[in-house]
Amino acid sequence: MPVQLTTALRVVGTSLFALVVLGGILAAYVTGYQFIHTEKHYLSFGLYGAILGLHLLIQSLFAFLEHRRMRRAGRPLKLHCSQRPRSVALCIAAYQEDPEYLRKCLRSAQRIAFPNLKVVMVVDGNRQEDTYMLDIFHEVLGGTEQAGFFVWRSNFHEAGEGETEASLQEGMERVRAVVWASTFSCIMQKWGGKREVMYTAFKALGNSVDYIQVCDSDTVLDPACTIEMLRVLEEDPQVGGVGGDVQILNKYDSWISFLSSVRYWMAFNVERACQSYFGCVQCISGPLGMYRNSLLQQFLEDWYHQKFLGSKCSFGDDRHLTNRVLSLGYRTKYTARSKCLTETPTRYLRWLNQQTRWSKSYFREWLYNSLWFHKHHLWMTYESVVTGFFPFFLIATVIQLFYRGRIWNILLFLLTVQLVGIIKATYACFLRGNAEMIFMSLYSLLYMSSLLPAKIFAIATINKSGWGTSGRKTIVVNFIGLIPVSIWVAVLLGGLAYTAYCQDLFSETELAFLVSGAILYGCYWVALLMLYLAIIARRCGKKPEQYSLAFAEV
């Protein structure tokens, strides 16, 4: 069968499959068919809930199977090309980084157990206030003939003040020379954003290495992270990129970082592990990822010059990098055997801005990703449809309940959300062997109250660019993220007041259900609050080097 015909059939097939999945979920939602229900529908279980429950069950099953496969992958690495050892370059993107985090990052890079690993750190900024990062580079990795640096007035796409065309070309050659000649190199360049920084590292390396590992400057790497990701790429030539397990370095600094830590574990070890089973991980995270350099150099220019609705894209760099690999028909994988720790926002507003930026890139890349559904397993199509449209179904459900339901319906909805969260959290406790994962059930409320409006705001402002979150040396508070959250809270409170005003007096049965549900919900929150305070009290006074992961060195 001709290749063009096969491709056309796959495109038609995956498109029809996506429509069937979306149509099925929509039909189940609209019809509201219920399998069982009590008198007056105080309690019920319907088709829509069954579909979501089945999705979680299947996702958890394949995640478990992928983890079992990972545990069997501990045999010695056999390189396909015995004549020449594989070469790897670690590219670190740095922007106004907290000095302590940067030191930890560079020290961890120095301890990576891989021979002749090349480390390239590119600093986004060449002003006087940025030189402290070069000083830290000299402190940790400098002082030997293997280290080199260059302070560049320009970058590859924008000339600095006083630069001529000749001096710009000379600067480009100097950057390449420093990177090629040095085991450890640091390039300071004119500010241009994270994508510009990553481009400089990739462009300067050219075809000098086999694989490129990416890392953020707030990341602490496990010494075995490189060899474990390399193992995945070497064992299957059809795998173009692989990501590792990203955990939180500052998880006990605040409640938001603590909840983020359990959410991170769930996202990587359940959601991405499931995607990895089918070879279609949709985002290789910036703190820990590795790509075949031969592929990366193919799409480097297209990746850098990406546009959306006529505007140049300056966020979602890692997700688009992953999508470019998928667009070539190569598989993307995840391995929990490769680990790192990374910083996460400890303040609500900074976390909200980060989530809004990630949501922007998610929806934009969802559209791009849909062009390549036909090149991969049907799971990629199915999961993209479910996760892409789920927030909109949830928003419609919440608004309908708060404006057309009863007080009991609202309380039951909250209880159901927490019940689903508890089920997922219990499975995570079993999979990880850590009771702290029970707090994953609280993240569902954070999702409902903050992430839903942030996603809508992200769609409305999808063409707004920038780093999204400020550098960590100087934290800049951006209150714009509070606007959609405030509107959402006002909508919900208005619906609650309207429902309470319109509802008739409670019957004895309704009152009993309402009081019982409220007491149960309150006890649940009190129990988790006490557990959280106990965990924090136990951690109080412990130093960072006592964290469970040995590579989290100060």
UniProtKB/Swiss-Prot annotation:
Phenotype of the disrupted gene, per the record: Deficient mice are viable and fertile however absence of HAS3 increases the excitability of neural networks and drives the formation of epileptic seizures.
Gene Ontology CC terms, in alphabetical order: cytoplasm; cytoplasmic vesicle; Golgi membrane; hyaluranon cable; nucleus; plasma membrane
EC number: 2.4.1.212
GO annotation terms (biological process): extracellular matrix assembly; hyaluronan biosynthetic process; polysaccharide biosynthetic process; positive regulation of DNA-templated transcription; positive regulation of hyaluranon cable assembly
Localization terms from the record: Cell membrane; Golgi apparatus membrane; Golgi apparatus, trans-Golgi network membrane; Cytoplasmic vesicle
Pathway this chain belongs to: Glycan biosynthesis; hyaluronan biosynthesis
Enzyme class: transferase
InterPro entries membership: Nucleotide-diphossugar_trans
Function: Catalyzes the addition of GlcNAc or GlcUA monosaccharides to the nascent hyaluronan polymer. Therefore, it is essential to hyaluronan synthesis a major component of most extracellular matrices that has a structural role in tissues architectures and regulates cell adhesion, migration and differentiation. This is one of three isoenzymes responsible for cellular hyaluronan synthesis.
Annotated gene: Has3
Mode of membrane association: Multi-pass membrane protein
Protein's UniProt name: Hyaluronan synthase 3
Cytoplasmic topological segments: 1-15, 66-378, 431-441, 496-516
Stretches of the chain found on the membrane's Extracellular side: 37-44, 400-409, 463-474, 538-554
Entry-listed glycosylation sites: N463
Single GO molecular function: hyaluronan synthase activity
Cofactor(s), names only, from the UniProt record: Mg(2+)
Post-translational modification: O-GlcNAcylation increases the hyaluronan synthase activity, HAS3 stability and its plasma membrane residence. The concentration of UDP-GlcNAc controls the level of O-GlcNAc modification.
